[in-house]
Amino acid sequence: MDLKTSYKGISLNPIYAGSSAVATVSENGKILATPVLDEINIIDLTPGSRKILHKISNEDEQEITALKLTPDGQYLTYVSQAQLLKIFHLKTGKVVRSMKISSPSYILDADSTSTLLAVGGTDGSIIVVDIENGYITHSFKGHGGTISSLKFYGQLNSKIWLLASGDTNGMVKVWDLVKRKCLHTLQEHTSAVRGLDIIEVPDNDEPSLNLLSGGRDDIINLWDFNMKKKCKLLKTLPVNQQVESCGFLKDGDGKRIIYTAGGDAIFQLIDSESGSVLKRTNKPIEELFIIGVLPILSNSQMFLVLSDQTLQLINVEEDLKNDEDTIQVTSSIAGNHGIIADMRYVGPELNKLALATNSPSLRIIPVPDLSGPEASLPLDVEIYEGHEDLLNSLDATEDGLWIATASKDNTAIVWRYNENSCKFDIYAKYIGHSAAVTAVGLPNIVSKGYPEFLLTASNDLTIKKWIIPKPTASMDVQIIKVSEYTRHAHEKDINALSVSPNDSIFATASYDKTCKIWNLENGELEATLANHKRGLWDVSFCQYDKLLATSSGDKTVKIWSLDTFSVMKTLEGHTNAVQRCSFINKQKQLISCGADGLIKIWDCSSGECLKTLDGHNNRLWALSTMNDGDMIVSADADGVFQFWKDCTEQEIEEEQEKAKLQVEQEQSLQNYMSKGDWTNAFLLAMTLDHPMRLFNVLKRALGESRSRQDTEEGKIEVIFNEELDQAISILNDEQLILLMKRCRDWNTNAKTHTIAQRTIRCILMHHNIAKLSEIPGMVKIVDAIIPYTQRHFTRVDNLVEQSYILDYALVEMDKLF
């Protein structure tokens, strides 16, 4: 089998990270906008064709502080730390308005008609902007602190247009946009007001309105007011959580319901009359909180924005109809995955990736389809809770149906794929280590339909072998506290564990600079491999031979013989610690990645680095392969994935086709030149991009056509010949740039400058100078041509001047006779 030397990859970058701004979504739920530091991603959420529509780079390179999509999805408004408000039109893909605001802003709101935008500043001021026309319609002052919440009220053709605002001091104000004045000032909160909503209440006399306000003082206030009488506090409800968002809903019977979200990452529905909690989401194990709620589809569904930049979709309308007390999350979108420590291909079709990240939850994401012309963004993430602290590593069986995870909570968990729900369930939990579990290993041979054992390594410097119970009809999680054996393995932390292909031995790699080989059946030490100068990060068995690879902080990978337990090859080339290594291509090659952000593909027989894949800017922690190296996925500390696909055969075929075509074209060029077909020879030489052959074509064409050129008065000047001049006259912009570049190079040499000058003359005769100057890069090329042209002109002018001496001498000689 040929060596794999060429890979093509696609990058999957975090879509939401490094910004305090809350993501925003259009009312129909199809367009999502998320900040990434000083950039913004606008994403099409249409199932099956998810893609980034626009990527906005902030010219001032300042972090995005607030952004808001208009409900109709036509405009995106955003503010950066540079205090610039910008309005981006999605259809044209351009910023149509930009204006300076008086202070930094962290809150924006758009009205239901997508015509008005409210901007709240840290100086307590509020401006209302006409989105389409880009001018300020209102300016309000009166708050004593930073504006922390805004909410429009008003419908198309309505006479009542209001804006409610809250600040960090707990003050709430209601502004009349028609009369341009403050209607009410409310001071019942003792902390920042983060949620506001207004709803109309049926009244016989005149429309009455209810105002809802929620703050970080763990309470929500319900007010009643109209356009004439004072605002009346109806009730204050303690909600036992810091409120980051709140609003009104209606159930199927028209009953008014209040939702709140915030602390403890809990979203809850509250009866507005009794104040009792009707339903709520489960509290996650990880310490998170909800930073925003994004209602879509007329409040029937909502995106919950978590502090780890995960978006969870809930169907409020359906949840209100059922009798369950818990609100179920229907799907999740991962803004980023943080630091990916380890990963494996899982699922019945191995089309998913299980991730161990800096989170207690096991994350599983879909693998993008690289076979199509454009892969749909794999934004969905399945989140499985079970551990109470961060995951260190994981392993999976070859069929992808069983996963083992290792955590800092001193436990390991085995997960089983449920064919009915198409989800993974906790199968067994292993408790027994006295420190963090750092590595796990499952058998490579699953003969009875389930893995029979689990290996774990821990920071307590021990390794344990556990029995995995036989599956039963019961779905109860089995807690295993007694291991089959425990061995003191190393003197320092154990970083990796690998099981041999035949499940007879296993290897451990440690910071103590050694790799140890153990008998899997009885746990006895068989060999100690010590040749590295620094701690080991990874160890991997070869599936097709008795070989073992270890990677180390000494920047090397070593290949060991399992017969002699000696080093066969030392692979050097990384500039930093090598984090992962694995055999591919039936042991002919080895792949490694390191803290230098590079992936290297090695020839095991020669020790030569065949290919270096550069797609990361940070330390590579995770690397996984499938189909013996046909597919590779790598992930770094920034949460960036690179999916690599082997295209060696395709590239070889393309190179062969390219070489074949080049031979045919070169032969055609020779035929054209021998026939004197200078036009086709010129065009083909341009296509081949052979400077010397192009020069020879022009030179020979000039030599053969000089005798035929007629420069009598009244006739058009011909530079080469009429056909070739005509061919130059119809060149496109790209061809003109290429030809001018060749003229620039020829013009630097006294032997070739004549052809260069004639070619330039021909171009200037047949092409408009103004249009030539508009071609990108043309002016720069001309600037490089001018100095040498002036030098050639001076030299020719001096020769002409010197020729006058000969004329003078001849005249004087005639006088002697």
From Swiss-Prot:
Q: Does the keyword rRNA processing apply?
A: yes
- Cross-referenced PANTHER family, in alphabetical order? TRANSDUCIN BETA-LIKE 3, TRANSDUCIN BETA-LIKE PROTEIN 3
Task: Note the superkingdom of the native organism.
Answer: Eukaryota
Which source organism? Saccharomyces cerevisiae (strain ATCC 204508 / S288c) (Baker's yeast)
Q: What else is known?
A: Present with 8070 molecules/cell in log phase SD medium.
Protein's GO biological process: endonucleolytic cleavage in 5'-ETS of tricistronic rRNA transcript (SSU-rRNA, 5.8S rRNA, LSU-rRNA); endonucleolytic cleavage in ITS1 to separate SSU-rRNA from 5.8S rRNA and LSU-rRNA from tricistronic rRNA transcript (SSU-rRNA, 5.8S rRNA, LSU-rRNA); endonucleolytic cleavage to generate mature 5'-end of SSU-rRNA from (SSU-rRNA, 5.8S rRNA, LSU-rRNA); maturation of SSU-rRNA; maturation of SSU-rRNA from tricistronic rRNA transcript (SSU-rRNA, 5.8S rRNA, LSU-rRNA)
* SMART domains, A to Z: WD40 (SM00320)
| A cellular component annotation (GO) from this entry | nucleolus
In UniProt terms, what function does this protein have?
A: Involved in nucleolar processing of pre-18S ribosomal RNA.
User: Care to name a GO molecular-function term for this sequence?
Assistant: U3 snoRNA binding
Q: Does the keyword Nucleotide-binding apply?
A: no
- Keyword terms, alphabetized: Nucleus, Repeat, Ribonucleoprotein, Ribosome biogenesis, rRNA processing, WD repeat
Q: Where in the cell is it found?
A: Nucleus, Nucleolus
Read off the SUPFAM superfamilies from this record: WD40 repeat-like
Q: Where are the WD repeats?
A: 59-100, 102-139, 142-187, 191-233, 238-280, 386-425, 432-476, 489-528, 531-572, 573-614, 616-654, 664-705
Entry's InterPro entries?
A: G-protein_beta_WD-40_rep (IPR020472), Utp13_C (IPR013934), WD40/YVTN_repeat-like_dom_sf (IPR015943), WD40_repeat_CS (IPR019775), WD40_repeat_dom_sf (IPR036322), WD40_rpt (IPR001680)
The name under which this protein is listed is U3 small nucleolar RNA-associated protein 13
